[in-house]
Amino acid sequence: MNFSESERLQQLSNEYILGGVNSPSRSYKAVGGGAPVVMKEGHGAYLYDVDGNKFIDYLQAYGPIIAGHAHPHITKAIQEQAAKGVLFGTPTELEIEFSKKLRDAIPSLEKIRFVNSGTEAVMTTIRVARAYTKRNKIIKFAGSYHGHSDLVLVAAGSGPSQLGSPDSAGVPESVAREVITVPFNDINAYKEAIEFWGDEIAAVLVEPIVGNFGMVMPQPGFLEEVNEISHNNGTLVIYDEVITAFRFHYGAAQDLLGVIPDLTAFGKIVGGGLPIGGYGGRQDIMEQVAPLGPAYQAGTMAGNPLSMKAGIALLEVLEQDGVYEKLDSLGQQLEEGLLKLIEKHNITATINRIYGSLTLYFTDEKVTHYDQVEHSDGEAFGKFFKLMLNQGINLAPSKFEAWFLTTEHTEEDIQQTLKAADYAFSQMK
């Protein structure tokens, strides 16, 4: 494929935009470098770049575009609302309608607040949990990404009794001292952390199904034990469902798994492609938030009518019969086809699939925790990524990310993707 115009625009972008991108995940640094492809438009399962190349898109903006690009129903809703006004600074009926649809789908959201991003949503749930428990420390799991606020950009210590260290320049050591990081799916490490820190722990922050070092399921009983241990300690359980809400079924992962948290953060999919975040949970906990309680949270754009209208339209698409069955079926076809090709070409790789989302890891063991992904073959992934890109398959440029299917992908797209993977694997021997 010819990418000359993307390369020209990336050089121009570097003059004005720091690093040439507005999020580091969009650079190709993790796959050997090079100019990122500059996209011009998207329709359904496809993206089109500035050089006129067409791509089958599995990046899907890192997850939000589950109904495909420029879905007619969502696009129409956005256009209609834009003509009426995009921001009022007052309550709107759309906020009420959207909140009701969300609570109907996710019953644990007894009370809801909207914000503008997943980062904001998680950041605020932590503040609310601290206000409710009157404690300061939190526990998070290694490898899970919860946004870029200071408190969650913390790397693991050497063990469950050790405090974390900043995972980014600009995060104070004093902040990192409030965070304990333990391995996902290691209930003994979690018990040890709770036993050691006891009544200092305000909350544990959990991705019920991990989406930030690929797609990783909790081990049987893990989430149930986390809930029990936490509640026995007076610690709140916060689920980060920014990736998982409405990903696998019409609702949240918590309902699919049958394990209910105290608070939930959500975002991505529910905005229909527009900026959004939100959080909610038990009424007695949520009443800590202003204007009813002492924990402050506000936002000029929070609950704006454009995002509310897009979110309502998106849920109207997802609540139709057969949507998630189709995603699961296509995901199964893609997984089975890739596994056959891995065997055919004797590639060291494995796949985690959860319904219509999957991750291809270049490692020889089934992935259940972060260290396995950290030590997987990033060089092999980088080669695979570029071989696929040059055949019109758009993936996330990182070995840690997932492939996302949409309502608009077809069986023909899967077959074309497998044909591209067949060639890519053949060039990696």
Curated annotation (Swiss-Prot):
MF GO annotations: glutamate-1-semialdehyde 2,1-aminomutase activity; pyridoxal phosphate binding; transaminase activity
Cofactor(s) of this protein: pyridoxal 5'-phosphate
Pathway: Porphyrin-containing compound metabolism; protoporphyrin-IX biosynthesis; 5-aminolevulinate from L-glutamyl-tRNA(Glu): step 2/2
Compartment(s) of residence: Cytoplasm
Keywords: Cytoplasm, Isomerase, Porphyrin biosynthesis, Pyridoxal phosphate
Reactions performed catalytically: (S)-4-amino-5-oxopentanoate = 5-aminolevulinate
Tree of life domain: Bacteria
Short name of any one Pfam family annotated for the protein: Aminotran_3
GO CC term (a single one): cytoplasm
Matches recorded under InterPro entries: 4pyrrol_synth_GluAld_NH2Trfase, Aminotrans_3, Aminotrans_3_PPA_site, PyrdxlP-dep_Trfase, PyrdxlP-dep_Trfase_major, PyrdxlP-dep_Trfase_small
Coiled coil: none
Quaternary structure note: Homodimer.
Entries under PANTHER family matching the protein: GLUTAMATE-1-SEMIALDEHYDE 2,1-AMINOMUTASE, GLUTAMATE-1-SEMIALDEHYDE 2,1-AMINOMUTASE 2
Protein name in the entry: Glutamate-1-semialdehyde 2,1-aminomutase 2
Organism: Staphylococcus aureus (strain JH9)
